[in-house]
Amino acid sequence: MIDLKIETAENILKYSYVLLENEFKNIQIGNDLIPLVNNSPLKKEKAERPEMNHFLLTKYNAVEENILYSSKILYELLEKEKHIDQLFLDYAKSQGIIINLNIERILYLSLTFLYSLGKVSFNQNMISRTES
């Protein structure tokens, strides 16, 4: 008796006598029918990657998801010391958007960026511009 292992596409082709091709161009393995079309997992085609535009500052479509842009707006809104929640609400009002989890994450990253440049300082939950 022949030891039959069907694990990979190579083994399927090797033991092709197990496979039956019916009139509808399908391969039958037991009760499973696998269609022989271009999108079949047996026929892998090399997909071309789209070219990347390296001159964009961000890979996102929404300008609010750009950390540099958001940092600039947050810095302009910090005329005086503000609570972090009030700063985020002012940002949403000035941009005409609703804050969601992704926007809030971008705003925290923007504040971290400004802090790393030494442009803002934190005192508990209060944020202010630094005099430089």
Curated annotation (Swiss-Prot):
Q: Which domain of life is it from?
A: Bacteria
Q: Which InterPro entries match?
A: ABC-3C_MC6
- Name-wise, this protein is Uncharacterized protein YydC
